[in-house]
């Protein structure tokens, strides 16, 4: 059977946008957007009419209709508390498991966005996560969470590698050190601010291997208790559903 090599090659190098893979190509995304008003984050702009209070197009609107938890103009949340900049930028961990009871009133995001996942509590406490690379949450290294050292930023820290703060290597701008840099804030080099009242540097305290192993055991026990609670919750749901069907089935026979 003859094969048109030119036709096959043209299909492989085709620039058709519909052939490109992407998260917005999932079949369940239209259902999420139409039924619940949330879905995957895209570059679609927010609907101006919806932001002002009402959009006549409803779910058929081509623009985004963010949930109330993502609207930053409100002064209070559903719980009556002041809005949190952290809550409005993190994905709800219960939503990912299908167990969020707050629904549209949840203070966290109900969407699938790996870049907005909350920080893994297990990894943040001991640097260990039993899920490893399969964990859906962010693994932030302890060194990245440390504040920068003011002494090091000004040129020298007497504690060196023992300092409890982060030493970020930056190249000082020679023009700024001399007195004036024509690039100003757009300069690619560092422009340190010289402060007269710097806090004294402190020595970093490292945990022993026994302390780390104890924290890992506590994390494993906590995760096992959480799995047990989820199993009990699902079993109760299942028993309740079968009970309802059993009652209706019994009435029909009588």
Curated annotation (Swiss-Prot):
One of its GO terms (cellular component) is mRNA cleavage and polyadenylation specificity factor complex. The keyword Transport does not apply. Residues 65-84, 207-254 are annotated as: Disordered. One of its GO terms (molecular function) is zinc ion binding. SMART domains: ZnF_C3H1. It comes from the Eukaryota. The keyword Cell cycle does not apply. Residues 207-239 have a biased composition (Basic and acidic residues). GO terms for biological process: mRNA processing. Residues 68-84 have a biased composition (Low complexity). This is mRNA 3'-end-processing protein yth1. It comes from Emericella nidulans (strain FGSC A4 / ATCC 38163 / CBS 112.46 / NRRL 194 / M139) (Aspergillus nidulans).
């Amino acid at each position: 059977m003859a094969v048109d090599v030119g036709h096959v090659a043209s299909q492989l190098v085709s620039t058709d946008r519909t052939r490109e893979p992407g998260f917005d190509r999932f079949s369940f995304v239209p259902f999420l957007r139409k039924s619940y008003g949330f879905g995957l984050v895209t570059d679609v702009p927010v609907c101006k009419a919806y932001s002002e209070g009402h959009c006549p197009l409803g779910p058929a609107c081509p623009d985004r209709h963010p949930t109330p938890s993502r609207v930053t103009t409100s002064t209070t949340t559903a719980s009556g508390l002041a809005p949190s900049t952290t809550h409005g930028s993190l994905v709800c961990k219960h939503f990912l498991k299908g167990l969020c009871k707050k629904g549209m009133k949840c203070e966290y995001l109900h969407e699938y966005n790996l870049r907005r996942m909350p920080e893994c509590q297990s990894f943040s406490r001991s640097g260990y996560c039993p899920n490893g690379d399969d964990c859906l949450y962010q693994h932030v290294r302890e060194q990245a969470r440390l504040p920068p050292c003011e002494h090091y930023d000004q040129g020298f820290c007497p504690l060196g590698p023992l300092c409890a703060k982060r030493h970020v290597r930056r190249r000082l701008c020679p023009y700024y050190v001399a007195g004036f840099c024509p690039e100003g804030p757009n300069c690619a080099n560092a422009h340190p601010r010289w402060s007269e009242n710097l806090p004294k540097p402190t020595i970093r305290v490292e945990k022993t291997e026994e302390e780390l192993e104890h924290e890992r055991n506590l994390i494993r026990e906590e995760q096992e208790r959480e799995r047990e609670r989820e199993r009990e919750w699902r079993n109760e749901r299942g028993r309740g559903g079968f009970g309802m069907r059993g009652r209706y089935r019994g009435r029909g026979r009588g």
